[in-house]
């Protein structure tokens, strides 16, 4: 396994908060980044769920463990099914080959199991949604 999906999600969201609070400039940079992401993920011609499925494919292609964990969580929050997520993942495998497949069958699989399990409590979900500005 390439990492604990829950820990990766907590570390990323905590890291963004810590980065933003270090200096005024970093606060502005973090806010600008998060605004750009928020705007790009708003419902438009493509809905939020579809955009999260695209993001999973991109994250797998680039082999970013933090991105894979984050977008697996967000896709589930948007109502994506495991089957939809795995099909989006397989599109990335068509372009990324073995490395994308490796992350699909390990980290993505673990993330889906983790975020749908009892070990990922309601409190965990609330903390992450608040940190992401989705609460």
Q: How should each PLM-predicted stretch be described?
A:
Residues 54, 58-70:
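Short, thiol/selenol-centered motifs that function as redox-active sites or metal-ligating centers
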């Amino acid at each position: 396994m390439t990492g604990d999906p829950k820990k990766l999600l907590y570390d990323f969201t905590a890291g963004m908060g810590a980065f933003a609070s270090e200096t005024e400039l970093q606060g502005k940079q973090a806010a600008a980044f998060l605004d750009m992401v928020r705007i790009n993920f708003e419902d438009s011609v493509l809905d939020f769920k579809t955009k999260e499925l695209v993001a999973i494919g991109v994250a797998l292609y680039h082999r970013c463990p933090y991105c894979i964990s984050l977008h697996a969580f967000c896709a589930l929050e948007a109502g994506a099914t495991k089957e939809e997520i795995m099909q989006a993942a397989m599109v990335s495998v068509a372009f990324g080959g073995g490395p994308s497949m490796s992350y699909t069958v390990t980290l993505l699989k673990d993330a889906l199991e983790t975020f749908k399990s009892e070990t990922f409590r309601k409190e965990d979900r609330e903390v992450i949604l608040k940190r992401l500005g989705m609460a």
